[in-house]
Amino acid sequence: MRGTPAVLVDGKPVGAKDGSMFDAAGFARTLKGRAWLRRVGAVVEIPAELVEVQLRYGGAAGREFVEGLPGRVAEFLERWGLRVAGPAMHGMTALVLPVVRADGTEAALKLLVPDEESAGEPVALRAWDGRGCVRLLEWDGPTGTLLLERLDAGRHLSGLVERDARAAVTVVAGLLARLTSVRAPEGLRGLGEVAAGLLAGVPEAAGRLADAGERRLLRDCAAALAEVAAEPGDRLLHWDLHFGNVLAGEREPWLAIDPKPLAGDPGFELLPALVNGFRAGEVGWRFDLLTGVVGLDRERARAWTLGRVVQNCLWEVEDGEVALPEREVAVAEVLLGRAG
């Protein structure tokens, strides 16, 4: 019989799936608990930040995710013959456990809250088949649970950008060239739909901005987006390729993780590499390097990047801000030819 995992948050037991409190320490002392721990190799400790975010912002789905983690961890450790091999890691919507497969292969078990963005992740990973990205080993459709190849979570490109921004941007450019060479599979969300939503949201967002110059800037970015929105493209986009989503690997030096896949124009992919690790004066050469390596038409890439600026600005306004983010303003001014 499968045991329920000993799941802790900051060393304290969390509720089990049936709503009862789970005594992790007591469980670990029982015969059943010791047998379970021999299989998984460790107590699974859930990062408190993940729990807090899901309970505060995730609504019913977030609470269900947290309460279901003990049973879900146990289910997939047993189903896929896995043993926990280290402390849990997390993003805002996912728990990642380093594991070892029955044959000794290192892997990562990713349990996440299913949503529109995460639903496309296995589709994209299968299409890329490890070319420039983490390799998908197993996938459960109903829960969205993934088993991925193990990368080095302690070595990501964010560390390199601080020392050598040009080298880091070159890595991202090379990955984008490979990833966007693949045509998007049928059924993925399209950039045309996203662009239409952005354009529809600009008038209200601009009206909330305190500065007239920023209102004009946002509208000008939207005008550039409108020029290309009718031809959204058909490439498989990562949509979140910032430096923290590029990890060191063994079979390749750097590989992309955590895609939020979209079918569209590769020009929509550039902004994270322009604003992450931002330094004034670097926007121009970063844009030149990215468009050159990926092989993009500069004018279309400029317009789609300004569209991505619109997206980030709308998110800020939705969160109650009345001023545009400084990094996005700097990028927009360079691409619109207004930088001093």
UniProtKB/Swiss-Prot annotation:
It holds the Pfam family APH_6_hur. Keywords: ATP-binding, Kinase, Nucleotide-binding, Transferase. It is an enzyme of class 2 (transferase). One of its GO terms (molecular function) is ATP binding. InterPro entries: Kinase-like_dom_sf (IPR011009), NH2Glyco/OHUrea_AB-resist_kin (IPR006748). Its EC number is 2.7.-.-. The active site is at D240. GO terms for biological process: secondary metabolic process. Belongs to the aminoglycoside phosphotransferase family. Potential phosphotransferase that inactivates hydroxyurea by phosphorylation of the hydroxy group in the hydroxylamine moiety. This is Hydroxyurea phosphotransferase. It comes from Kitasatospora aureofaciens (Streptomyces aureofaciens).
